[in-house]
Structure formats: C-alpha cells, structure tokens
Amino acid sequence: SEMCIRDRADKLYRPASIEKVVTAVTVLDVLGKDFQFQTTLSYDGVVEKGILKGNLYVKGGFDPEFMELDMDFLVRAVKEAGIQAISGKLVGDVSLMDSIYWGEGWSWDDTPEAFQPYLSPLMLNRGCVDIKVSPAAKGKAGTVEITPESDYYQLNNRSISLHPEAGKLKITRDWLTNGNTIDVSGCVSSVRKRTLNLYDSKRFFMDTFCYKLNKEGLSVSKDSIFFLTAPDST
C-alpha cells in the first residue's frame, strides 16, 4: 500500500477518549471477557491471643472499582480472623507495576483532576476523594463532606456561606507541592461537588486501611506500613 496523504504524522497527540476503544478491545483479547481484578489479603506468622506475630499483606491487582465498601470488607475479614493487633508490618504489595504513575505524554498540569489519578496496583476510590460543600448560616463557614473518610488528607476550609464578597467558590488541593490538603475557599451559595485526585494512591490506600483498622479497635501503627515494589521501581 502507498501513503495517500500525511498531515503532522510525527506530532505526538493525546489520544483522548478514542483510546478507550483500543484499550477495551485489547483487554478483551488479552484477558478475556471473564477476567476479574483481584485485591487479596493474607498474613504470615501465627495469631496468638489476638496478636498477629507476623505481617499482614494486601496485594494490589489494579482493581479500578475498589471502593470504600470493599475496604470495609477487608477490615471485617481481619477482625474475623481473630486479629486484634499486628506486631509485624502492614505490607502493601504493589509489585505488579513500576514506579511511573502516569502514562507517557500525560500532562502534569492535569492534576488534581479526577481523570488523572496517580496509578497504582492499590487504588481506593480511583485514587480520588469526593467533596461536597453545602452552605450553612450566612457568614458562617460552609459545611464540607469528604469521602472516603481517612486521615491521609487534611482540610483547609476558608469558605463563607451566602457571602458574595468572598468571591467564587474554589475547591482544590496543594498539588504543586504534592500535598494532600483540600482547600475550600470563596462563597458557598448552593451545594457544590467536586472529585479530586490525591498524591500517591498506594499510600492513600494503605494509610486509609490502617486508619479503618484502628477505628475498629485494632492496634496497628502507621509506622509499620511497608511496600513491596517491582524490582525496577525507585
């Protein structure tokens, strides 16, 4: 065959949503229609008097739909195993992926948008938080709800309810410094929602898992969190 016409053939373009078609066809061909993503929970050592004398492992399988309810299921599984405390490590196995969390050609300034998460085999809520801001009494700070519940992120609420002089409502995070402080400012005149990514999805997953274990009365230290990575990861 011969080339009929060529226009900027060597220029790198972002494929946009048409890439979803190529991805879907490839996944169906390589993995098959019955493939299921798996996030597995296991431990080594022994459980004596409620204390796990060993390590607790969560192995990520790139599940894009692993949500807060799924994490709550993992927490229940730990409790049902009779574990009340962990003397070893809380291990996040992310060895299915290298350390490059964005694809080649992805724009760095698309963060903190939800469509550009920091990819990891361990993804909670697609690596994002859902934020809802509602007005309170006039002149008071707006009411901010963030899910999933976690202590991995912080909230800086500078919004003012029903006060136009406060300016346009802004919901963002300190992404330029890879921070995870959610900043809400401006006038809250009606209910507003936004979804933002968080920096370091694997850490978001494991920190939140530890937070939820502690909330259920299990003794687990965040200092015990450890990651198993691919051999070529940094």
Task: Report residues per predicted region.
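Short, small-residue-biased leader/transition segments that mark boundaries at the very start
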Residues: 3-4
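A common structural microfeature
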Residues: 10-12, 18, 38, 55
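Conserved serine DD-peptidase/penicillin-binding transpeptidase domain
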Residues: 30-234
